[in-house]
Amino acid sequence: MELFLTGVVLKPKGLKGELKVKPVTDFPESFLTRREYYIGKTPEDAVLRKVQSARFHQGFAWLVFEGAGSREGAEALVGCGLYVTRDALVAMPDDRAYIHELIGLDVFDETEGRVGKISDVLQMPAHDVYEVDTGDRKVLIPAVEDFITETDLEKGMVRLKRFKEFL
């Protein structure tokens, strides 16, 4: 089963097992409606836990899980990731994509043809940056309209302009 990270447990609050969670999703409001998460240090060791209560405050989700209703139970989850299955992911608008959908896409230049594959997506404050593996080296390309002319998930490709400027 493939799991996707949506949040990271930062610290407990109080004596009743409430956890401060940093969302790592474009849809933080989903923490208010999702009733279960897989929790673990890695996706491989994550176990399914039901949400007892949820609230959102100052950019963080505050969750209480069944079976972790004490401070000690909450402290055991600090540093763990909160994961969901593919079918539990929020649907993206047509002009957006999840990072896992972008990694592995073939990258084409308007004049040179295929130049490599996206090997990673770096999330920067201003915009994402695609790491393109050309085979010889890795090149960082800002994921903005000035450089990305087309992204087609169905065809498995991204088209760039002015790629040589990054070499």
Swiss-Prot record:
Q: Spell out the subcellular localization from the entry.
A: Cytoplasm
Any single biological process term in GO: rRNA processing
Question: Keyword Chaperone, does the record have it?
Answer: yes
Kindly list the GO molecular function terms attached to this UniProt entry. Answer: ribosome binding
Query: Where's the PRC barrel domain?
Result: 94-166
Q: Which GO terms describe its cellular component?
A: cytoplasm; ribosome
Keyword Secreted in record: no
What Gene3D superfamilies has UniProt attached to this entry? PRC-barrel domain, RimM
Sorted UniProt keywords: Chaperone, Cytoplasm, Ribosome biogenesis, rRNA processing
Give the superkingdom in one word: Bacteria
Oligomeric state and partners?
Answer: Binds ribosomal protein uS19.
Role description: An accessory protein needed during the final step in the assembly of 30S ribosomal subunit, possibly for assembly of the head region. Essential for efficient processing of 16S rRNA. May be needed both before and after RbfA during the maturation of 16S rRNA. It has affinity for free ribosomal 30S subunits but not for 70S ribosomes.
What is the protein name for this chain? Ribosome maturation factor RimM
Look up and give the organism this protein is from: Chlorobaculum tepidum (strain ATCC 49652 / DSM 12025 / NBRC 103806 / TLS)
